[in-house]
């Protein structure tokens, strides 16, 4: 038992080292520095042990409908966790179902949850004047052929399928099946966009992101957008919005710092269909 505890401690040390390796002098906020300073009070040299993140490939499926897969430089996370909505600011709405991370480019698509912000939910449907942004049930199946997350809503069923990645491409699909008359339904992906960096589109749009709102239509986008070394291939009808400030439970309201803003790619769903998207690296 003692050796197992020691091994767990060594892995935690390596994981802390892994996380701090992503910090640079350009992305350290005062809040982050303060938290690191707190950790430094307890720092001491010690051994480390390999962790799954050090392996070229691995996957793990939890006992609940959530899992993670690493394929070379790519890490994808699927979450079908369902929780009863509450009014407490400390319990976020479990509305984000996909995250995509690249070891050199960082987080690209975030499945971060929020509060009272359906525009950041993976799916929304408007029924009887109300917007529903969380599934009623879910199921996750992970295999080497593909990872599939099924999500049930009131008027449709969606399967989010993540196919095996190559070194420079991670493809994923959304398969939509109406269960009756399809409500006003939208698909949304949260994109980790960085203020001060350039974003460009296949249709010729090119700007440096700042606090000015962007609401680009499908005519403005074309079939891809490019940002910070990655390109997102998007289906017809997609729209882009920036900036959107996620909910901060400590403020009990949206963030106010542009550094923490995200963008969204949204598509209106029209019936039984399959949407194919992919993230590619330069």
Task: Label each PLM-derived region with a short phrase.
Residues 1-239:
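Extended polysaccharide-engagement surfaces of secreted carbohydrate-active enzymes
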Residues 222-282:
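Beta-strand-rich recognition/accessory modules
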């Amino acid at each position: 038992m003692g050796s197992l505890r020691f091994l767990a401690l060594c892995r935690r040390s390596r994981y802390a080292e892994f996380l701090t390796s992503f910090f640079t002098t350009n992305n350290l906020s005062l809040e982050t520095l303060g938290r690191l300073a707190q950790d430094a009070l307890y720092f001491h040299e010690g051994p480390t042990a390999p962790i799954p993140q050090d392996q070229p490939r691995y996957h793990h499926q939890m006992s609940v409908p959530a899992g993670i897969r690493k394929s070379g430089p790519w890490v994808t996370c699927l979450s079908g966790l369902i929780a009863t909505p509450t009014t407490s600011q400390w319990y976020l709405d479990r509305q984000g179902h996909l995250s995509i991370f690249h070891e050199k480019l960082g987080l690209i698509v975030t499945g971060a949850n929020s509060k009272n912000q359906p525009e950041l939910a993976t799916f929304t449907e408007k029924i009887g004047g109300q917007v529903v942004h969380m599934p009623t049930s879910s199921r996750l199946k992970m295999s080497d052929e593909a990872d599939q997350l099924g999500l049930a809503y009131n008027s449709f069923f969606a399967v989010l399928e993540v196919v095996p990645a190559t070194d420079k491409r991670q493809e994923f699909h959304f398969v939509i099946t109406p269960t009756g008359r399809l409500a006003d339904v939208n698909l949304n992906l949260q994109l980790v966009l960085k203020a001060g960096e350039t974003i460009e589109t296949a249709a010729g749009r090119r700007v440096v992101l700042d606090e000015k709102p962007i609401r680009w239509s499908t005519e403005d986008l074309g079939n891809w957008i490019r940002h910070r070394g990655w390109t997102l291939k998007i289906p017809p009808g997609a729209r882009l919005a920036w900036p959107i400030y996620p909910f901060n439970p400590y403020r009990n309201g949206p963030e106010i710092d542009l550094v923490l803003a995200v963008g969204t790619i949204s598509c209106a769903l029209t019936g039984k269909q399959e949407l194919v998207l992919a993230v590619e690296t330069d």
